[in-house]
Amino acid sequence: MSKDGVKNAAPIGIVCKGKDKLGCRLFVGTKNLKNIMETRRYVVNITFDPINFVNSTIGNLDIEEFTDDDDLAILKNAEAYVICDVTDIRKMDPIKDHVTSNGEAYIISSDVVEIVKNHPCAKALNRGVFALLECLTNYTRLDLVSKEQQDYFIGRFNENNRMIKRVSGQDTIKAMEILKNSMIKKGFDVE
């Protein structure tokens, strides 16, 4: 939410840094970074709504998607949400990675102020699990496709594996290692 009370939401990756401690990396130019720098507070909405994911990625959600809370951007259909107060905003050294050539970004460190579960089984999505599912689907097709398509699947595996090592829990990382070993046994050259 902006300092002027304009609510917005966008998918971001949150990393658990310890008990009641969260962190994230936000790139310069995003509304989220601007708002967090201005207000030093934000809400992590946990939702499974694919329409909200798309709309909040390509633009902003309609005001009707948010609750009537005056000072927080809480989604009406959130499975759960976490209110965070920023403890530190640190500019990262410029990096060149798969996302951007200049890598101008900030690391946001936060304390969890409150956790609200609207549904008893609320669980955050992790893109690593979906990347694993993509890799598993591609794996089942490796013996059925052309060499060109195999190379594409291997490239996707390598990229997904790199990402999973950064954003996923140990179970997903271990699952990718098992899949990698099986691919190597089949004669595929994976990283």
Locate the predicted segments by residue.
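Basic, polyanion-binding surface patches
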Residues: 1-81, 85-191
